Structures are given as structure tokens and as C-alpha cells.
Amino acid sequence: MKKTPVFLESLVTNMLRLRAICPFSWRVFQFRPISCEPLIIQMNKCTDEEQMFGFIERNKAILSEKQVGCAFDMLWKLQKQKTSLLKNAEYVRDHPQFLTLHNLATNKFKLMNDDTLVNVLYVTQQFAGEAHDPLVEALVTEAWRRLERFDIKLLSEFSSCLADQHLYFSPLMGKIADIVHRNLETTQDLSSLSVLMVNISSLISRHFQQQLVNKTELLFDTIDSSEVNVAKSIAKFLRNVRYRYQPLLERCNNVFLSNVDHLDLDSISKILSVYKFLQFNSFEFIIMAKKKLTEMIPLCNHPASFVKLFVALGPIAGPEEKKQLKSTMLLMSEDLTGEQALAVLGAMGDMESRNSCLIKRVTSVLHKHLDGYKPLELLKITQELTFLHFQRKEFFAKLRELLLSYLKNSFIPTEVSVLVRAISLLPSPHLDEVGISRIEAVLPQCDLNNLSSFATSVLRWIQHDHMYLDNMTAKQLKLLQKLDHYGRQRLQHSNSLDLLRKELKSLKGNTFPESLLEEMIATLQHFMDDINYINVGEIASFISSTDYLSTLLLDRIASVAVQQIEKIHPFTIPAIIRPFSVLNYDPPQRDEFLGTCVQHLNSYLGILDPFILVFLGFSLATLEYFPEDLLKAIFNIKFLARLDSQLEILSPSRSARVQFHLMELNRSVCLECPEFQIPWFHDRFCQQYNKGIGGMDGTQQQIFKMLAEVLGGINCVKASVLTPYYHKVDFECILDKRKKPLPYGSHNIALGQLPEMPWESNIEIVGSRLPPGAERIALEFLDSKALCRNIPHMKGKSAMKKRHLEILGYRVIQISQFEWNSMALSTKDARMDYLRECIFGEVKSCL
């Protein structure tokens, strides 16, 4: 037999001696688990926090860094099963064994692997009570040290931890953005990328933003159609960067539509919020969301959940649901927090609900919490209460005092503009010298949005103050001059259309002072060659809002549309056509431009939102363009039924606007395209709408008397006449073949009375109703809204009305208010001569 080596015999002997001398140590050594698996299995068997804390107490001396991570993970899993998360989080956070676990993590975090480190950070943040938890700070620092080796999944989880701490602008988030940028080409995990996109969205350039959008489009087909969270993150990213990118939004919307049965209140609420912000319209989703949310009404019996339901469902609910929501909110109103009351007020504004009882209850909650609101929230409160016609001196006095105190201590341009805007909306919008000096101090740092907001506010003050504060008005006029100076300076220093576009996104051209608007148009013309398929829709939308006719810009837009039509998303077409309609302008290649646009949209007519299709049809009608396919798509029973359904979920004012545009389109087609044989079906609507026509104001009565003198008596002129198809004519008279006025006889109306319909039929052409050779004359006084801002060029709606009146047999005389109020017509005699020239001479229009 082979002899055992001496060193082995010695080793065994020593071990046996050790066992005899230290039986306790041997026992501990013998029964200590070699693997961490048994402890993890024990943790997984815990069914509540008490069991977990008992486990931690028993094993705190032997828990490894991995087991510490598992303990945090298990506590979070148990926490998510609770109905009252906040209350239970306090219980966990205050438990002595949670502090034990906290200390263990503090001692062992450097030994943790990357996944465990980030997971412990996430869970610790969920339970953290202190604003600056030392463990959280240590974990973030350690993660920063390891950042370069994180894979994209871990990077996204870590970025979410930073986002939870509101570190969107931190150097660390910037480092994450840099890593994403460097690795974008090889990234294939859209789920993780979409989370990162949201978290780094505050730091990225426009070029990087477009790269992320392109990458998302490439990877979108790699995700399952049930990946709602990915679609939500993508939509949220587009919201954060203010980019209404139609193709991606549609793909996200398709995911939401296919999973709507699985969406909860929180998800639907967030999706609707994104759609509202980006002005993305999805009739199908809203209808399905409305049904789902309505079913939740009986289930939401807690203020937090009911407020969320009220905000999401209220603006799209039907009359009965709105009534139910408001009555329930009245019962809960006293239990609202300040944040919830603000959300309810915003929803009431969206609903255009002026329920005085609910407004009173909500404002009483707002009043209690007024000191805790931030400037932007105070602006929202002011805007909504002004819109809802709320009047309570005590509330507005406190609001004004609070806004002024904020203003005196604010040095951030955007914040100052928000505060000034809110003050200008108050019942007494006066601003003292301290306020004016605060505006002047931030002017050099202001962007176009801030400058435009200041200008609008100052104009409100001048309008309010000019009657009794001459000295202050002079200072306000000087402030306007400074605003103009800095606005021009900013525009002249613009070196990129992309950067300019960013500032234009939230601007409305009709709020721009005249001189600044001219400079803006000149700047856009300077960058005209940079207008392309990506930005043409945005530029067109801005021009539509300016009422400023720039033929150079419109020609460029038309050229881009024709040459790059295949790259333009079809749903951008209505925005591209709109400025031509509003400004009544035909580009050189008019027929090719309009034909190309309509052809590009034809295959999408069935899926375009109904009200957008109506607006498009109306825009084309003002341009005398009537594509038969489009009109057939609108004027059929199926489409009109869809439109009726959509009108129920629109706000009252928007619904009324859609109905009015449909009527105008119907009227235009009947008058200008009788060959299409589309019936007129708006008699009842027009009768209801025109019930609101009141008597003549002072200026109209003055003109009426002058016309009566010119024509030979008040029985020779009519005011506020309704024509067939319900056009309203300011003044009407009839001349016989010898240019002699014909009296109306028994049809004469007294001053200020509602006129009768002049003709019985809404269909007949009126020429046959007159004596041979006689002519019916319509005198139209055009205010500033009827003309372009820069030249006396008639806008689209006024031009269309003139065409219609001529089809109905009128000779149309249009007089602009600029001509009527000019120095040349400053006396009554001059005006009388002018009217005689217009009516009896050859002058048909002063334009």
C-alpha cells in the first residue's frame, strides 16, 4: 500500500486539533452557507416587510453585497403591492432594520457589481426621506466613476435615477448624453434608448435630436406592438424637445390604439397631455380613451385619482359625463391639495366650464395655497380665471401682491416675462417704475418669445393707463422702443434658420409689433434658401399667423412643396396651404402647387381627422380650388357622422369654429361649383347663428345717415342685410338703370333693429327680382382684420365673400377703415363725396 505523504498527515492532524480546541468556531465555519443562494431563497419567501426586516436583523452580520442588493429589491417589490405607497414608504423608511440595511449598503457599495449598484440607488431614492441622502450621493458618485463601462440598459436606469433627482442639466447627465451620442450607431435596444432620450432631452443639440429621431424610426419595427412604455417614452421625448414629428407620433399612436384596453388612467392621462401639447390630433384614440375613461368614473373615489380623471376626461366628455364629473368634483373640492386645485382649474379652462359654484370652491383652495405656487403656475391661475370670467377683488389683490414681490426679486428673463404677463392680465394691470426697471434689466438676455410677451403686456398697460397716467405712459412708450431695439438686434444677429425656428415655435405672429414683424420677415427672407421639406410646415404656420404678405417667402414655400413633395409628410399639407388661403395669394405655379399638394394627400383622406379635412377644404375654397375627390370625401353621410362624433369631444369654441367652416365650405361649393350638385344643408345652423346679430353701433349709424343723405332717404338703404346663403352685408341699396336709387318701401327698417331676410328664396339668383337694368349694391366696410398688415391687400375670406356677393348679383363696393379714417376723408363733406363717387361713379373699391 502506498504511504501517505508526511505533509498531508500533518495537515489533517492540525485540523483535528483545531476542531478539538475551538469547537464553536468549527461549528460556525461548518454551518455558514458556502453560497449566497439559500439566503436569497429565504428573502424571496418573505411576504411582507416585517418578515424582511426580521430576516435582515437575523443575518445582518453575514449579508454580502449581493444579498444587500437583493434585500433592497425585495423591499421595493413588496412596496409596489401596497395601495398607499406614500404611507407605506414612510413606515419602511422609519424602521430600524431599514437603517441597518442602509448602513450595510454604505459599507459595501464599492463591492457591488454595476447592476446591483444602480438597483440599490433606485430603491434607496424611492424610500429616501432626506433631500440629500448620503448613501444616494455615494452611490451616484460611484456610478459616475464606472459610467463608461455601463451597457445601454444600465445607463438608461441610471439616467432615470438622476432624472428622479431633477439633475437634467447636471454635468453627469451631460456625460451620459455624450456616451449615447458616441454609441448611437451601434445601439439596437430601443427600449433603453427611448428612456435615455427623455432624460437627456434638455441637453441635446438640434442635430443630435434629429439623429435620435432617425435612429428611433430605424429601430421602431424591432419592438413588439405591445411595447406601450417605449411608445410613451418616444412621445414624451418629442414633447420635451417640442418636435411634432408626424411619422413617429403616428407609429406611437398605432401602438396606443392596439393596446388601449390595457392602458390605465395614468397612461391615458399622459398620452392625452402629450397630444395636447404637440397639437397632435388622433380622433380614433380620443374616442377610445373617452370610452375607457368614462368607465372609470365610478371607480375613482379618491381625490388624487379623480382629479387625474377629471383632467383627462373633462375636455373630451359628453354633456352628461361633464355634469357627473363636475358634481363629484364639487363634493371632493374641499379635500384638494394646491397642486390638484390648479389641475382642476386648468381642466375647467379646457372645458370652457364657467360653473360658478365649482370655480368658487376651487379658487378658495387656490387662495389658501397661493404663496406656494411658482411664477409659471401663478400665470396659469391668472390666465384661467380671466378666461372663466372670475371676479373676486380679494383674490386678485393677493395675487397681484404676490406677483409683484416675485418680480422685484427675479433676474431670470423667462421668469420676469411670465410675471409681467400675469400682471398685465389682472383687472388692474398697472406696473410701477420698479417693475419697468426690472424688465429693462433683463432685456439684453431676452429671446424673441420674451420680447414678444413683454411687448404685448406693455401695450395692455398703455391701453389701460393712457387716460390718467400720462407720465407712466411715456415711460411705457420708451420701454416699447427698447423692446423694438433689442428685438431687431436679436433678429439681425441670427445666423441659422434652425435656431430661429426654435424661437418661432411658440410665437404667434399677430402679437408681434409692426416694426419687429417687418424685421422678422426680412430675416426669414435672408434664410429663404434654407427652407426645405423638414421646416416648410413650421415656416408656413408662422406666416399664417402674421397676416403679413411676403410673396418671396410664399413663392419659396410653394416651390419647396412642388419639388420636395415626396419627402413632406401628407399631414403637413394643410399647414403649407393655409398661408396662401389666409393671405389670398396665388404663387406663379398655382395650379401645379395646389394640385401636387392635394394629390399627395388624396390617399390619406380616409384617416385624416375630420375637422382638419374641413379646414383644408375651406382653405382651398378661399383660393377658388375645388378638388372633386376631396369634396366627395367631405360631403357624404359617413364622413359627416364621423365629424358629428368629433364635435362632441372638441371644446365648445373649437366645435363652433369647425361647424362654421363647414357651413362656409358648403356655401362656397353651392355658389361656385353648382355642377357638383352638393346640397345646401345649413339653413337651420345659419338662422341660429344669426340670432346674435344686434343693432348698429355708433359708427354704423353715422354711415347709415350719410348713405341715406346720399341716396335720398332712409328708405333707400338697408343695414345688416342677410343674403341668400346668409352672407351679412353691411349696407345695401338698389339703383335703377338710370343710376337712380330705388326705395325699399314697406321693407324699410328702423335704426338698430334686426333686419328681415330680404328675399324669400335661398336658391334663386337675385337678378330676376330686380326691375330691368337695375343693380343691387353691397357696401362693405373692411376693418384691419380683413386686410394684410403690411399692404392694403384683401385677405382670403374677404375676397371669397366678394366673389359670392357678385355671383348673387351684387355690385360690391369695399371701403377699408384706413381709407375711411384717412386725412383725405376727415370731414363729413369729403366722406359724402367719396360715397357718391363709389355708388354713382366707376369706383368699386378703394383697395
Swiss-Prot record:
User: Which is an annotated Pfam family here?
Assistant: FAST_2
Is Transit peptide one of the keywords?
A: yes
Q: In which tissues is it expressed?
A: Expression detected in spleen, thymus, testis, ovary, colon, heart, smooth muscle, kidney, brain, lung, liver and white adipose tissue with highest expression in heart.
- Mind naming one GO cellular-component term on file for this protein? mitochondrial matrix
Gene Ontology biological-process entries: mitochondrial RNA metabolic process; mitochondrial RNA processing; regulation of mitochondrial mRNA stability
Where, per the database record, does this protein carry N6-acetyllysine? 360
Q: What does this protein do?
A: Involved in the down-regulation of mitochondrial MT-ND3 mRNA levels which leads to decreased respiratory complex I abundance and activity.
Q: Which family does it belong to?
A: Belongs to the FAST kinase family.
Q: What is this protein called?
A: FAST kinase domain-containing protein 1, mitochondrial
